[in-house]
């Protein structure tokens, strides 16, 4: 009996040490969000997640009254992609909700973050607040199910124009007036126009944003772009007084570019080919430093190694 107890305790001790080692190794690896690019049709959610994406980017176009209308990019778009796939925005949100609600037959546990690329270029500056207000109402009804067991993914509102910072204000104030200010815990922000980092910071000050900031940098895969601004964003992220929490680079379709982006310290890679990014992350040099982010990773928290 004593021998049996000794064996059990020995096994438990070894198991505990192994578990502690796994936790420590996980904590030392930067979590990476593989962002499936231009996922605008509901069926593409499955397609991109099955290829390895744990995040998707979806385009949102607005009508003349600042209502979010379609998930649609249009031409031109990335080389090698169809630019014309679309859904009604409300329908896409319902499909997305199913894909991110535990227990649903379409649920993907892996899909933890959604970037809405808000095509506000069709709007006047003074419509930005209304666009945020109407966007919030759509998400509240069709994605969050009015706060009753809705989709669980984190949401990034990506705005191309710094002058449209009031979209953030309209979104936040609407969730509050509708009785669900807590949902802002699931919402982050990005200005995607490749503006000067200092100008981006000033826009956030105007919007009253003090956290949950992703900073994008990039260009269509048809063209080349260096990593100098990415490195500037990473420097801001890692400084004691920076406003950026996470940095992502788009559109990355090649292994060499993926390695360069990871070496620069990004947290996310937006791609048309998630399997390419997964392959690079599985290379020994990168497997030791990075891991694919899960729902347990807070996308608003700056990674400290």
From Swiss-Prot:
<keyword id="KW-0456">Lyase</keyword>
<dbReference type="GO" id="GO:0090729">
    <property type="term" value="F:toxin activity"/>
</dbReference>
<dbReference type="GO" id="GO:0008081">
    <property type="term" value="F:phosphoric diester hydrolase activity"/>
</dbReference>
<keyword id="KW-0964">Secreted</keyword>
<keyword id="KW-0443">Lipid metabolism</keyword>
<feature type="binding site">
    <location>
        <position position="57"/>
    </location>
    <ligand>
        <name>Mg(2+)</name>
    </ligand>
</feature>
<keyword id="KW-0865">Zymogen</keyword>
<comment type="function">
    <text>Dermonecrotic toxins cleave the phosphodiester linkage between the phosphate and headgroup of certain phospholipids (sphingolipid and lysolipid substrates), forming an alcohol (often choline) and a cyclic phosphate. This toxin acts on sphingomyelin (SM). It also acts on a broad range of lysophospholipids, like lysophosphatidylinositol (LPI), lysophosphatidylglycerol (LPG), lysophosphatidylethanolamine (LPE), lysobisphosphatidic acid (LBPA), lysophosphatidylserine (LPS) and lysophosphatidylcholines (LPC) of varying chain lengths. The substrate preference is LPI &gt; LPG &gt; LPS &gt; LPC &gt;&gt; LPE, LBPA.</text>
</comment>
<dbReference type="InterPro" id="IPR017946">
    <property type="entry name" value="PLC-like_Pdiesterase_TIM-brl"/>
</dbReference>
<keyword id="KW-0442">Lipid degradation</keyword>
<comment type="similarity">
    <text>Belongs to the arthropod phospholipase D family. Class II subfamily. Class IIa sub-subfamily.</text>
</comment>
<feature type="binding site">
    <location>
        <position position="59"/>
    </location>
    <ligand>
        <name>Mg(2+)</name>
    </ligand>
</feature>
<keyword id="KW-1015">Disulfide bond</keyword>
<keyword id="KW-0460">Magnesium</keyword>
<dbReference type="GO" id="GO:0005576">
    <property type="term" value="C:extracellular region"/>
</dbReference>
<keyword id="KW-0204">Cytolysis</keyword>
<dbReference type="GO" id="GO:0016042">
    <property type="term" value="P:lipid catabolic process"/>
</dbReference>
<keyword id="KW-0732">Signal</keyword>
<protein>
    <recommendedName>
        <fullName>Dermonecrotic toxin LrSicTox-alphaIA1ii</fullName>
        <ecNumber>4.6.1.-</ecNumber>
    </recommendedName>
</protein>
<keyword id="KW-0479">Metal-binding</keyword>
<feature type="active site">
    <location>
        <position position="37"/>
    </location>
</feature>
<keyword id="KW-0325">Glycoprotein</keyword>
<feature type="binding site">
    <location>
        <position position="117"/>
    </location>
    <ligand>
        <name>Mg(2+)</name>
    </ligand>
</feature>
<keyword id="KW-0800">Toxin</keyword>
<feature type="glycosylation site" description="N-linked (GlcNAc...) asparagine">
    <location>
        <position position="282"/>
    </location>
</feature>
<keyword id="KW-0354">Hemolysis</keyword>
<feature type="active site" description="Nucleophile">
    <location>
        <position position="73"/>
    </location>
</feature>
<dbReference type="GO" id="GO:0016829">
    <property type="term" value="F:lyase activity"/>
</dbReference>
<feature type="disulfide bond">
    <location>
        <begin position="79"/>
        <end position="222"/>
    </location>
</feature>
<feature type="signal peptide">
    <location>
        <begin position="1"/>
        <end position="18"/>
    </location>
</feature>
<keyword id="KW-1061">Dermonecrotic toxin</keyword>
<feature type="disulfide bond">
    <location>
        <begin position="77"/>
        <end position="83"/>
    </location>
</feature>
<dbReference type="GO" id="GO:0046872">
    <property type="term" value="F:metal ion binding"/>
</dbReference>
<feature type="propeptide">
    <location>
        <begin position="19"/>
        <end position="26"/>
    </location>
</feature>
<dbReference type="GO" id="GO:0031640">
    <property type="term" value="P:killing of cells of another organism"/>
</dbReference>
<dbReference type="Pfam" id="PF13653">
    <property type="entry name" value="GDPD_2"/>
</dbReference>
């Amino acid at each position: 009996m004593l021998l049996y107890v000794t064996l059990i305790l020995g096994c438990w001790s070894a198991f505990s040490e192994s578990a502690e080692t796994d936790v420590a190794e996980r904590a030392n690896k930067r979590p990476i969000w593989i962002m499936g690019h231009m996922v605008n049709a509901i069926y593409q959610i499955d397609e991109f997640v099955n290829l390895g994406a744990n995040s998707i980017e979806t385009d949102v176009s607005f009508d003349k009254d600042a209502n979010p209308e379609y998930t649609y990019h249009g031409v031109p778009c990335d080389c090698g992609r169809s630019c014309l796939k679309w859904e009604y925005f409300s329908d896409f949100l319902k499909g997305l909700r199913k894909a991110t609600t535990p227990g649903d037959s379409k649920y993907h546990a892996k899909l933890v973050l959604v970037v809405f690329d808000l095509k506000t270029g069709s709007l006047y500056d003074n419509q930005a607040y209304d666009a945020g207000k109407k966007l919030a109402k759509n998400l509240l009804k069709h994605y969050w199910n009015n706060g009753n067991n809705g989709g669980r993914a984190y949401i990034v509102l990506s705005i191309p124009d710094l002058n449209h910072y009031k979209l953030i204000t309209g979104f936040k104030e609407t969730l509050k007036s509708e009785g669900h200010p807590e949902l802002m815990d699931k919402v982050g922000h990005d200005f995607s126009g490749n503006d000067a980092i200092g100008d981006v910071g000033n826009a956030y000050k105007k919007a009253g944003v003090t956290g949950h900031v992703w900073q994008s940098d990039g260009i269509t895969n048809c063209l080349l772009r260096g990593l100098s601004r990415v490195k500037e964003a990473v420097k801001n992220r890692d400084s004691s007084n920076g406003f950026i929490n996470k940095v992502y680079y788009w559109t990355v379709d090649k292994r060499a570019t993926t390695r360069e982006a990871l070496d620069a310290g990004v947290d996310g890679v937006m791609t048309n080919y998630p399997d390419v990014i997964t392959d690079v992350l599985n290379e020994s040099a990168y497997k030791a430093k990075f891991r694919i982010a899960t729902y347990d990773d807070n996308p608003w928290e700056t990674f400290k190694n």
